[in-house]
Amino acid sequence: VLTFEPMPKMYFNKSIKNFRISNQKQKINLLKKLKVDFVITKKFDKNFSKIKSTDFIKNIIKKKLKAKFIFVSNNFRFGNKREGDVKQLIKYEKKFNYKIIKPKPLLIKKKNSLIFFDKILFTKRQIR
């Protein structure tokens, strides 16, 4: 799992204080409970925010992470000025030898309300 610190949304909007569901330590502990092999926390700063989406795919996803499977939500954006999206990742699947997986959003029904999470939740069985 690749995660960023600070979260890009918080980096670009300094007025956001309570955007997180969990802090970084809690997030890592939750991922460990899901038996994630490793968690990479990348410092998100001005230089990293300037990386073009194609360079992110080539240099981060392919060369550094050597990713074979990439789990993303439909609204996932990346790269300088959020230029990259899921369509672009799919476009490069064959060239860089990875597979995009878009799990269905989690929908929780509670009394008198509906909670919709467009985040990625999966089990080990789903990635085998």
Predicted regions and their residues:
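Nucleotidyltransferase catalytic core that binds NTPs
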Residues: V1-R128
